[in-house]
UniProtKB/Swiss-Prot annotation:
Induction: Expressed after 12 to 24 hours post induction of asexual development, which correlates with the development of metulae and phialides. Expressed in vegetative hyphae. The lineage of its organism: Eukaryota, Fungi, Dikarya, Ascomycota, Pezizomycotina. Aerial growth, conidiation, and dispersal of filamentous fungi in the environment rely upon a capability of their secreting small amphipathic proteins called hydrophobins (HPBs) with low sequence identity. Class I can self-assemble into an outermost layer of rodlet bundles on aerial cell surfaces, conferring cellular hydrophobicity that supports fungal growth, development and dispersal; whereas Class II form highly ordered films at water-air interfaces through intermolecular interactions but contribute nothing to the rodlet structure. Keywords: Conidiation, Disulfide bond, Secreted, Signal, Sporulation. Residues 1-21 form the signal peptide. This is Unclassified hydrophobin dewD. It comes from the Eukaryota. Self-assembles to form functional amyloid fibrils called rodlets. Self-assembly into fibrillar rodlets occurs spontaneously at hydrophobic:hydrophilic interfaces and the rodlets further associate laterally to form amphipathic monolayers. It is found in: Secreted; Spore wall. Disulfide bonds join C27-C81, C41-C73, C42-C60, C82-C91.
Amino acid sequence: MHLSTSAAAILALSLAGPTMAGRPYFCPLALDAKFLQVPYCCEGFVPARDSKVSFEGVNCIDVSSDEDFVKTCPKGGTPKCCYSIGPKVICTTEVGDGVDK
């Protein structure tokens, strides 16, 4: 069975929707690959290989599970919406406002 890109995106959102309820942040699907993203704080960014819309994060930490989520990273800057592939963290968008708990 082969799903179209839009059907796959709708399926991903329907499966992830209940888990996103009540989060103080919002991360859309990745702009380059339509993966689910979560907030990461990174010390820096370099252009991702073969992409015009994404960046590879440098020394990143996942802050999605922080009890008191804040929009400021420990070393300054703001969290970015990213996904991980192996040891790499790929970021494509800014973190948006979610639903407060």
